[in-house]
């Protein structure tokens, strides 16, 4: 309350001060000084150069030890005005009331806690008093118990020693009793067939009998036990040799014989011999299933039988052998490995024979499942008998079967391709029914392409089963690398594409062999098929293969560009051969028409010969046929009078000097020399020039071969006047229709000029027909 009285009231502001407004300036300076004091870390007294703390002897210091209320009140009355004193009193009253209220609240809030704490302390004091009493009683009881225990121990010391001695004697007597009863126990166990119990009895007593065998009584017991043990060993050997029981029972017999001290080497040989008999029986059972009987199980059942019978038995034999004859060391392990290697090779031979019967089937799913079970079953013996190499041999068999399946699928693709070509041949050779058109070349080409592509996809899906994640051998290095790159991509896909190209090229053989009977339309279709493969199909197939079979092998593979180049070359050869075949067909007609006619005695021409009409018809049909598969191509600019030109013996400049009216015998000139001079300035015609992949180039090649044949045949014949005129009419007719098929019409003009000029040279009386008459005959024809 003294502090509250000393504090100025909240209502005393600057206006109530006696200084009034004049005190505002010093107040601001004090605030500024206070901020500086806080900045430099100085107290108010230090900032003014005075001591920082109040005087401890000051009687007006409310917090000091020498505070004097009377002095403090006198000071306030002297220094403070009445208004400030009243404000101080009001503020003091308010603070006293607030303090009183806070103290009452504090007392009320903690009253219950104080009461509870008091009760708890009182109860703890009572409990500790009771505990001290009980501890005292416990200490007294413990002292009494200790005293009694000491007296009892002292009293029982001598009897305890006697009891210990008696217990030892009793145990010895029990052991002796067991030893004396051992022969009878062994005999009873042998009679009951409890061979394991008998061996355990013998094992427990063996060391004692060996130790005390110098005593007559123990010696007799040992002799009796040896006789019984010998009989027991004989019965165990008899049971083991009978082999009627399974592998676990035989292993138990061997284990008991080893416990009886029988020679391990001899038992090892007998154990393997009996195991060989059982496993060979399993092999004979498997071999019996390889017969041609219709009731023979499928390959999946066969591998299940072999896995559960032979492989399971081999695992049992290996596990029992390693457990029983572990003391044999490396020699025993090698003996077991040789045993497993020999029988395993016979089992693998049977499996391969059975798998070979599946090579003709087209479904890989059952075969892959069988291979998976076969490979999975051999994991256990492969781990037990690592030295025998069973797992590696099984993997090699699976890899070999996979390679054979790839070869089988390649043959299937080749057969499918040949079958498609056979279908095309039949469709081309089938007679046309009136009013019903057969399939066109474009449709046949689409059918062949889709059929081949579907067979390729089916083969890829079939061989992809070998690399499925759920298959146990798919993680082997071969199936993650070489199988995908060299097997599927190179052997199957690339091999088939090359085989297809070779088969197509075989149709280009010389006449009289295979190519002589090949329909020209088939050559045209195959050339377009190979060209389509070069442009898109090869890239698509190889991309599909690489996506399905993620190649992890770094071995080199055939680039796409190489295959495309081979396919394009095959297409070029086929198209070139097509041009030759069609050209020879037309040439044969022209040659026969020239060679079988008597040109010296022929009549004056009135019509175009029928063979020329047939040539134009066949050429038009070829144009339609080629147009179904190939684009038009590029032609040179055509002259406006291509169809109006009329051939005559003087249409060529080299013949004008001979047949023009101005020619007189007084100006002789060798016509052959004139013809040869003209040839020097004419463009050379390459009859068998490379054929481009368009219709114009194909027709140009065929027409060049035909007209060149006509020219050579004409040069070998002699013509009369009317014969020359007939050739003139025929050539004009050909010119009217053939110029539109070739890339350059000048080529047709040049060759036909050569034909007419050659006929004129071979005519003794060359009198040409008037051009107007020729045109009339051709228009009428």
Curated annotation (Swiss-Prot):
GO biological process: endocytic recycling; Golgi organization; Golgi vesicle transport; lipid transport; lysosomal transport; protein transport; retrograde transport, endosome to Golgi
Keyword DNA damage among record annotations: no
InterPro entries: Cullin_repeat-like_dom_sf, Vps51
Pfam family, one: VPS51_Exo84_N
Domain of life where this protein originates: Eukaryota
Region (Disordered): 1-66
Example of a GO cellular component annotation carried by this entry: Golgi apparatus
Modified positions (Phosphoserine) in chain numbering: 17, 43, 648
Coiled coil spans: 115-146, 269-291
Subcellular locations according to the entry: Golgi apparatus, trans-Golgi network; Recycling endosome
Residue stretches of biased makeup (Low complexity): 1-18
Signal peptide: none
Transmembrane stretches, start-end: none
Keywords tagged on the record: Coiled coil, Endosome, Golgi apparatus, Lipid transport, Phosphoprotein, Protein transport, Transport
Keyword DNA damage: no
Family named by the database record: Belongs to the VPS51 family.
Function noted in UniProt: Acts as a component of the GARP complex that is involved in retrograde transport from early and late endosomes to the trans-Golgi network (TGN). The GARP complex is required for the maintenance of protein retrieval from endosomes to the TGN, acid hydrolase sorting, lysosome function, endosomal cholesterol traffic and autophagy. VPS51 participates in retrograde transport of acid hydrolase receptors, likely by promoting tethering and SNARE-dependent fusion of endosome-derived carriers to the TGN. Acts as a component of the EARP complex that is involved in endocytic recycling.
Subunit structure: Component of the Golgi-associated retrograde protein (GARP) complex, also called VFT (VPS fifty-three) complex, composed of VPS51, VPS52, VPS53 and VPS54. Component of the endosome-associated retrograde protein (EARP) complex, composed of VPS51, VPS52, VPS53 and VPS50/Syndetin. EIPR1 interacts with both EARP and GARP complexes and mediates the recruitment of the GARP complex to the trans-Golgi network. Interacts with STX6 (via N-terminus). Interacts with VPS50 and VPS54 in an EIPR1-independent manner.
Name under which the protein is recorded: Vacuolar protein sorting-associated protein 51 homolog
Lineage: Eukaryota, Metazoa, Chordata, Craniata, Vertebrata
